[in-house]
């Protein structure tokens, strides 16, 4: 039942000769070799004739004809292989013509040396890795490879290789690239390696051994800074070489990494001489971009002069979605078993804004960093640092001593309570302005500010951290809003249990959070008391969506369960609230209506909103959710002459005017397929203008989705896109089932 694997012929183990023939019919190789999850049945015939068993000495001829064979649950068909081995020299010819893998292979080589010679010609016409069960994603490829290496010794590499007719494809893309060519030449005095491709060029000339290059560079650095864990006995031959490298964002690279779009070519030139302990390196990148992160005019240099390795990294400017850099640099030197560094950040007027300078030196099994006492600048201000400060690190923890940063009445002090890296680490704030740090991140606008006083302590930092804090933040500011005064008390003296007391007061705010969070189980037992939350204090949190916000939110919530399945119980109610969305422009007034939370989700019980004319809209019903990720709806929305749009005519609006409606809407279904049944009437008080996209909108097509971007009204396009992006961060909306009857009063005006 496991097949028939007969072998016939002659075998003389004493003389090491053989003349064998094997024929199988559905032999279960997986069963025989106890690898049935990998191998299956095979049908083949094979011959072996010759002498010897050592590949370097045997004189043998082999032939294999695999009619079909199963590997990883795929049945291969039509494999041919012929091999001829004669005293260490060999030739091989093979082909496979299968619907999902087709190739022709010719090769020869000499195996007598430690590093064999090799000559290969491979024509790969088809390779479908998904069909062959080698990958879970669709990937097919095609290429032709020709290689001829008289020596494959990496320290005396000689030969050439070319890969051309290169094509890749997956489920959505066909990718092509130009040929790749590698040439290596070796003599007693020099090694040359040249690589050419669409995405990269390399020229490497001089005296070097590939297997020793990394050790040679480490040895040079070791002359100036003792690398931890590196023995002095590593033997490296003399090296003297030059390298020129260019990296380009080719179409193939951009198809694989589209976030690099906008990146320019990166070039590097390196010269290295181990005997003279010389290094000269320059790397230039006019623009490096990854998604929304951009750096302009990156320039990195390193050289050896005056018994040191001098280095500098400079950028003209750089930015991320929330971060901006101007004329920034990191520079210094490595010498005398120390790494000296200075970080300089300038503002857009080229004025020094942040400077941090210090020295790193090896210390036992780790390292020690010391701040320069006379060169610290934070947000334009000079700060004092004690002379005997240091931060020491090893695998067991961090030891900080005498690290107190001071400017006038501001200070932040870090100190370990003991003299070992496992000692508790304490931080003490005194009149410390948060903007000193946050303006490093957001230099053009104030992100966060406030005055911090208090203490915090961390124990077992690198093993099982235990954290306690007693901090007060006076006049906490977020962007343009002053939120109030914040008290943060956290006790983590019991492992995996955080006891918290958080209090927000001032600016008409009175909010308190008390309870515990158990990190090991991600469980919580928290109580939120909103005695009064001033909505105006938090307008900046929703600045892109909310034009204005005032009034109060009050109530209480108990939070239990875990982060994957939180349970909220309680209610929140508004008090004289008014919210004006940016996109509609109509103020929505909410008197004293509530949102109730229970085990099933949250509930609106005749939740009423009034427009600026006092007309009413009501939401009633439930939103059911087991985890605040999946939702099911049972809600109604009714309105009587309610003004949903009241926006002035502005250059950046795609609609403006007044839009008044009567509405009777039922919403059911879930987040995957909301079901909406609506009756809507547009009333006579309507005077509404909708600006259609211009005649030449920018159209971007991505995998069947066409996006229209109105260039004449970019701000509203951005607002609408940000709204869609906010939806995409929640459960995916797969569709909508909408049934609507819409009537229009004859006196309603539309443009």
Predicted regions span which residues?
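Interface amphipathic segments
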Residues: 1-457, 461-556, 564-664, 668-751
């Amino acid at each position: 039942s496991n097949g028939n694997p007969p072998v016939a012929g002659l075998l003389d183990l004493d003389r090491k000769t053989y003349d064998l023939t094997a024929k199988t019919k559905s032999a279960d190789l997986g069963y025989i070799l106890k690898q049935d999850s990998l191998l299956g049945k095979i049908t083949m015939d094979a011959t072996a004739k010759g002498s010897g068993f050592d590949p370097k000495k045997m004189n043998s001829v082999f032939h294999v004809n695999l009619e079909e064979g199963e590997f990883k649950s795929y049945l291969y068909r039509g494999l041919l292989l012929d091999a001829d081995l004669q005293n260490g020299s060999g030739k091989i010819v093979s082909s496979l013509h299968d619907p999902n893998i087709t190739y022709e292979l010719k090769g020869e080589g000499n195996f007598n040396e430690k590093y064999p010679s090799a000559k290969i010609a491979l024509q790969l016409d088809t390779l479908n890795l998904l069909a062959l069960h080698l990958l879970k994603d669709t990937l097919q490829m095609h290429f032709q490879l020709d290689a001829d290496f008289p020596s494959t010794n990496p320290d005396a590499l000689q030969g050439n290789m070319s890969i051309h007719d290169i094509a890749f494809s997956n489920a959505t893309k066909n990718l092509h690239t130009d040929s790749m060519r590698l040439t290596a030449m070796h003599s007693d005095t020099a090694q040359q390696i040249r690589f050419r491709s669409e995405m990269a060029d390399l020229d490497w000339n001089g005296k070097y051994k590939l297997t020793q290059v990394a050790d040679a560079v480490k040895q040079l650095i070791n002359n100036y800074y003792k690398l931890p864990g590196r023995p002095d006995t590593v033997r490296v031959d003399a090296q003297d070489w030059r390298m020129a490298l260019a990296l380009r964002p080719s179409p193939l690279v951009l198809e694989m990494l589209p976030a690099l779009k906008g990146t320019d070519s990166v070039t590097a030139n390196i010269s290295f001489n181990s005997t003279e302990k010389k290094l000269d390196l320059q790397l230039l990148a006019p623009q490096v971009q990854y998604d929304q992160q951009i750096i302009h005019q990156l320039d990195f240099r390193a050289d050896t002069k005056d018994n040191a390795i001098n280095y500098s990294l400079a950028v003209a400017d750089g930015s991320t979605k929330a971060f901006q850099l101007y004329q920034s640099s990191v520079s210094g030197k490595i010498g005398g078993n120390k790494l000296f560094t200075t970080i300089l950040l300038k503002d857009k007027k080229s004025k020094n804004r942040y400077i941090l300078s210090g020295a790193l030196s090896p210390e036992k099994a780790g390292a020690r960093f010391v701040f320069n006492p006379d060169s610290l600048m934070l947000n334009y201000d000079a700060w004092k640092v004690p002379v005997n400060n240091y931060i020491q690190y090893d695998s067991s923890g961090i030891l900080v001593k005498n690290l107190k940063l001071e400017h006038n009445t501001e200070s932040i002090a870090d100190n370990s309570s003991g003299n070992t890296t496992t000692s508790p680490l304490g931080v003490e704030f005194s009149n410390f302005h948060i903007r000193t740090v946050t303006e490093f991140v957001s230099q053009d606008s104030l992100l966060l500010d406030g005055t911090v006083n208090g203490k915090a302590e961390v124990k077992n930092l690198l093993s099982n951290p235990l954290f306690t804090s007693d901090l007060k933040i006076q006049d906490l500011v977020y962007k343009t809003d002053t939120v109030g005064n914040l008290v943060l008390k956290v006790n983590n003296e019991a492992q995996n249990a955080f006891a918290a007391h958080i209090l927000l007061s001032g600016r008409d705010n009175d909010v308190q959070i008390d309870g515990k969070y158990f990190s090991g189980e991600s469980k919580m037992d928290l109580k939120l008391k909103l005695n009064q939350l001033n909505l105006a204090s938090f307008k900046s949190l929703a600045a892109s969506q909310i034009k204005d916000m005032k009034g109060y939110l009050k109530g209480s919530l108990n939070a239990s369960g875990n982060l994957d399945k939180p349970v909220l119980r309680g209610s929140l109610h508004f008090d004289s609230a008014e919210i004006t969305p940016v996109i509609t422009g109509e103020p929505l007034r909410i008197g004293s209506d509530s949102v109730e939370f229970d085990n099933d989700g949250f509930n609106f019980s005749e939740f009423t909103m009034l427009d600026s004319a006092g007309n009413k809209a009501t939401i009633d019903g439930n939103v059911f959710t087991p985890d605040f990720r999946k939702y099911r709806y049972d809600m109604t929305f009714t309105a009587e002459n309610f003004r949903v749009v009241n926006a002035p005519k502005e250059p950046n609006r795609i609609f403006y005017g007044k839009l008044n409606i009567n509405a009777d809407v039922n919403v059911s279904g879930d987040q995957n397929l909301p079901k909406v049944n609506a009756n809507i009437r547009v009333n006579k008080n309507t005077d509404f203008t909708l600006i259609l996209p211009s005649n030449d909108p920018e159209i971007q097509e991505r995998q069947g989705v066409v996006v229209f971007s109105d260039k004449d009204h970019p701000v509203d396009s951005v607002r609408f896109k940000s709204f869609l992006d906010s939806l995409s961060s929640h459960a995916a909306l797969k569709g909508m089932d909408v049934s609507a009857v819409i009537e229009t009063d004859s006196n309603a005006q539309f443009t």
